[in-house]
């Protein structure tokens, strides 16, 4: 326990526009310390500085409040809320299907995981989990694993940039563009596509989808090897990451940390293995771990996880080739959002063929389509918790229904929010420069933290 005698005599707070006062106070302290005996009296001076929320090294609008003594961090706290968008509250005023458009924008670097967790929750409430077409589940897995690779590439790129490895940033974003191009081909959008829907996916793969993915599978392994050759044995990279941001298994369990940070302690915890969903139990892949408990171990885990994701994508491509023509949306027309939309010749709206199919199939089908789009599906009352393994850890959703066409409550357990609790444990007692490394190894996304 800290006693009053151990506390600093004076704390100087640096806000943003008070630098002149800080300099003046520091000079006064320096002058007084020249007197006999004053040096020892002021030896414990501390300064509180704000790193962020505009700092380029804080992964968005994260504010780190650091109390430093010299170059040593004595206390570290996180200031969040600068990117609050009220998504969870907005979901209470939208239909169950419209909610996908909102949740995909939370953790904007891994949108397919947000969508999948949401849809799995809705499907569990509806009791149709086992009725989802296999082809739709395979597409979900493929899109999530491609998304995992793109998210890890951003983590390595931004982490490298913050430590001065600009080449890593260029390589990471270059390879990510290849994956975003695949997303655009399949969903029409590079990010935030709302492609995964309750009951399946919005549309089947286009003709050019699988060939583009096959080309990606031949190119990415070589590109990833380039990044490994650049950083794995790089003297400066290892000096900045080895032993930095240390957090052991006890600390992770106490704070509820998941994802690469937890697996860097040697614990092989991965929901794809321990609580499989979307048929993950039928895929062949390994859970990557490391026992260093530091930033370098987390870097290695992300690099190796990308290779495991490529293995899963290869298996998905093989299954999709065998299931061409199979449905990608649940067959119950009272629940199924139309999954065969086609763009008209003007590039807007739906094609005449699609409209004719809806209106000419049956009067009952037209009524169901109208009610589905205007009112939305009715979900039986109840509550569920569903979790998926996102690039940052356990992404959970607690969903409550009161039997209506809109959620009563949807709460997300975002791993970025939970993992930020580790900042103090990782940074306190270390150098200011090492705080950058520690935060980069957590890889928080503030859209998911603040929601």
Curated annotation (Swiss-Prot):
Compartments reported by the entry: Cell membrane
Catalytic activity: a quinone + NADH + 5 H(+)(in) = a quinol + NAD(+) + 4 H(+)(out)
UniProt keyword list: Cell membrane, Membrane, NAD, Quinone, Translocase, Transport
Pfam families linked to this entry: Complex1_49kDa
One Gene Ontology CC term in the entry: plasma membrane
GO molecular function: NAD binding; NADH:ubiquinone reductase (non-electrogenic) activity; quinone binding
The keyword Signal appears for this protein: no
Main location: membrane
The EC number(s) this enzyme carries: 7.1.1.-
Topology versus the membrane: Peripheral membrane protein
Assembly and interaction partners: NDH-1 is composed of 14 different subunits. Subunits NuoB, C, D, E, F, and G constitute the peripheral sector of the complex.
PANTHER family: NADH DEHYDROGENASE [UBIQUINONE] IRON-SULFUR PROTEIN 2, MITOCHONDRIAL, NADH-UBIQUINONE OXIDOREDUCTASE 49 KDA SUBUNIT
Family stated for the protein in its record: Belongs to the complex I 49 kDa subunit family.
Biological role stated in the UniProt entry: NDH-1 shuttles electrons from NADH, via FMN and iron-sulfur (Fe-S) centers, to quinones in the respiratory chain. The immediate electron acceptor for the enzyme in this species is believed to be a menaquinone. Couples the redox reaction to proton translocation (for every two electrons transferred, four hydrogen ions are translocated across the cytoplasmic membrane), and thus conserves the redox energy in a proton gradient.
HAMAP family: NDH1_NuoD (MF_01358)
The protein's name: NADH-quinone oxidoreductase subunit D
Gene that this sequence comes from: nuoD
């Amino acid at each position: 326990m800290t006693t009053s005698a151990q506390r600093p005599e004076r704390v100087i707070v640096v806000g943003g526009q008070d630098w002149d006062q800080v300099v003046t106070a520091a000079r006064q302290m320096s002058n007084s310390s020249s007197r006999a005996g004053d040096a020892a009296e002021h030896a414990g001076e501390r300064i509180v500085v704000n790193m962020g929320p505009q700092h380029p090294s804080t992964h968005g609008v994260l504010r780190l409040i650091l109390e430093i003594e010299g170059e040593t961090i004595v206390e570290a706290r996180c200031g969040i809320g600068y990117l609050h968008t009220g998504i969870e509250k907005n979901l209470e005023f939208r239909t169950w299907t419209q909610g996908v458009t909102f949740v995909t924008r939370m953790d904007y670097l891994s949108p397919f995981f947000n969508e999948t967790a949401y849809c799995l929750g809705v499907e569990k409430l509806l009791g149709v989990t086992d009725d989802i077409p296999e082809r739709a589940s395979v597409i979900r897995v493929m899109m999530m694993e491609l998304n995992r690779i793109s998210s890890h590439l951003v983590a390595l790129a931004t982490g490298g940039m913050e430590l001065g490895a600009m080449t890593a940033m260029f390589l990471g974003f270059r390879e990510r563009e290849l994956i975003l191009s695949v997303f655009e081909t399949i969903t029409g959008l590079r990010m935030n596509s709302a492609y995964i829907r309750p009951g399946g996916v919005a549309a089947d793969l286009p003709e050019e989808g699988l060939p583009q993915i096959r080309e990606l599978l031949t190119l990415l392994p070589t590109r990833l090897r380039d990044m490994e050759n650049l950083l794995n044995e790089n003297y400066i990279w290892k000096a900045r990451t080895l032993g930095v941001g240390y957090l052991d298994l006890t600390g992770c369990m106490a704070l509820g940390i998941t994802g690469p940070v937890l697996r860097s302690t040697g614990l092989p915890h991965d929901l794809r293995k321990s609580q499989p969903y979307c048929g993950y139990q039928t895929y062949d892949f390994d859970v990557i771990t490391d026992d260093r408990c530091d930033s370098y171990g987390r870097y290695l885990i992300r690099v190796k996880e990308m290779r495991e994701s490529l293995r899963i994508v290869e298996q998905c491509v093989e299954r999709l080739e065998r299931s061409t023509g199979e449905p990608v949306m649940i067959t119950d027309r009272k629940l199924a959002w139309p999954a065969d939309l086609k763009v008209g010749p003007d590039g807007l709206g739906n094609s005449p063929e699609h409209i004719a199919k809806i209106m000419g199939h049956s009067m009952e089908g037209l009524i169901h389509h109208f009610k589905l789009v205007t009112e939305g599906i009715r979900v039986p009352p109840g509550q569920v918790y569903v979790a998926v393994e996102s690039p940052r850890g356990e992404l959970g959703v607690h969903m409550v229904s009161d039997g209506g066409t809109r959620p009563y409550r949807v709460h997300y357990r975002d791993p970025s929010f939970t993992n930020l609790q580790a900042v103090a444990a990782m940074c306190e007692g270390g150098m200011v420069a090492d705080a950058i490394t520690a935060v980069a190894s957590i890889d928080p996304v503030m859209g998911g933290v603040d929601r």
